[in-house]
Amino acid sequence: MSIKEQTLMTPYLQFDRNQWAALRDSVPMTLSEDEIARLKGINEDLSLEEVAEIYLPLSRLLNFYISSNLRRQAVLEQFLGTNGQRIPYIISIAGSVAVGKSTTARVLQALLSRWPEHRRVELITTDGFLHPNQVLKERGLMKKKGFPESYDMHRLVKFVSDLKSGVPNVTAPVYSHLIYDVIPDGDKTVVQPDILILEGLNVLQSGMDYPHDPHHVFVSDFVDFSIYVDAPEDLLQTWYINRFLKFREGAFTDPDSYFHNYAKLTKEEAINTAMTLWKEINWLNLKQNILPTRERASLILTKSANHAVEEVRLRK
């Protein structure tokens, strides 16, 4: 089916891997194999081929959008007769736990910062905006970590609102996966980036998710381009369990790790524990809160085995 025929039936243009890879045009590869190895997640196979065929075309598309946005800002400044403030272009990346959002974010940050324009690209994860464990315990939400109600949404919305308002120095809290908590007094200062990549589970949520509270303001209201990283549920579960097993042999062995006790589990016990955590927390959050937002994304990356993207859908 031609792209023209597809547009009559869906709000998305659909590309298989080869079609999407052809859109790279002549964009040069700016990352080495060593750099790619440092960017990938604990449980992912990220190759030069994946970067070349998926992420270089995506960085080219984003560069077009960002340049267009800057021209629009210049038109407004000319109309108003002002010297405009630096307003960052915000890209959000959503998707399930274990799907590879963080790797996608890091690769895009590296690629976008190496375009000839040398734009400053900041990466912030919404994990830092989780309520501290003490608050979650008081509210009975420790088993709902990652669900919308576990976040300090007011602070997260204020963060992106301040950036879009041109506030020069904006602070974001930082989360530690070692201690499984927000780091006290560990805020990171973001200083007028050209591009902000915001990575998190629920960054595509909108007023549609809260019909009882129609006056809510959401992160998605400030996002210029949104990406949803998708994969079949059976693969997500497998990736989550495999990641848990690797943490059991790595990060969990640190005596300071919140999950240090998991390091003592047998492999069978670890698999059963990971399965329980997946089904009772992460799968539930995916079905209730994350997956329903997928079709709001500007672009959907669908992965198959080995974290390889097999299909790209771009909102027209």
Curated annotation (Swiss-Prot):
Its EC number is 2.7.1.33. It comes from Escherichia coli (strain SMS-3-5 / SECEC). It holds the Pfam family PRK. Gene3D superfamilies: P-loop containing nucleotide triphosphate hydrolases (3.40.50.300). Its main location: cytoplasm. This is Pantothenate kinase. GO terms for biological process: coenzyme A biosynthetic process. It is an enzyme of class 2 (transferase). It is found in: Cytoplasm. CDD domains: PanK.
